[in-house]
């Protein structure tokens, strides 16, 4: 088997140059890189990443830790990956995707064995043991979402303004004349859930009002059923019990689809009799929605790109300032499509041929 010395000799360069071509630790000209790669291919040379990691104590692997729902990824998660992967490729890192089951907080011991240089953590929860575990092991981390408690000042994170966004989309529904707005939210232990609840309440407070009791529900048991099934069953029962509900706000597109199915079963026309709005926009489920769904574009790809860049700053910079906790807020947009209308609207009052309109959320 060819060695790095063989490649260097055949290519007429130093061992260090060959090493840098493969590790991308230092910039090498395009011409030299292509020449070395061609020689390596001819010699059938493959770098031994694990041997190298034992020497420099670096694996050049980034961990991405997220919760999976029965092995299905959401559009948000796909978009986030599309933001992370190109940066990893350009900077010579590999990505280890950890999709733990919903009870991942009891599986932190698995994270300790991950051969990663740093970790990106998604779906932050209150008292997140994943964050504490990484801090104790001195593993650089970036959280996508808001860390809870003192972690907010101890670790870098990337987030949307979830309080402000939830307030604005709720205000949008209120401005359309809706007063009974059902909010099908995520698990109560997630920080994003708490922030969106706060924004929802804030919108009513700004109008000098309070939402009716029982208008906020949470899917706390993620193992019992999918988000779609939960929202379908919840919307079906709540809309039957309370016909005064004229709008539903959901945590995800999948939940919104459940509401659409419940509305169809109850013969409620969207948006004439029921308005639906969700956090999330334009995903793989988009073709399932008729009329087109109004939603919030969270720009998950930008969240992913910013998160990996913050993490690589910690890994590659020696300046202490680059290791300080930083916060980045990614703006979101309300994309108005065909699923929301005024409470007093008449059938067919919404022109479905109009293109979606974006409003800064």
Language model regions located:
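Flexible loop/hinge segments that line or gate small-molecule binding clefts
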Residues: 122-167, 254, 280-293
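Short, well-structured alpha-helical segments in soluble
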Residues: 104-116, 230-244
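N-terminal helix-turn-helix DNA-binding module of bacterial transcription factors
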Residues: 1-58, 355-361
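Flexible loop/turn connectors
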Residues: 232, 236-361
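Hinge/beta->alpha junction and helix N-cap segments in small-molecule ligand-binding domains
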Residues: 67-76, 97-106, 158-168, 184-234, ...
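Short acidic capping loops at alpha-helix termini that bridge into adjacent secondary structure
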Residues: 179-180, 211-215, 270-276
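Amphipathic helical "hinge" segments at domain boundaries
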Residues: 27, 34, 43-108
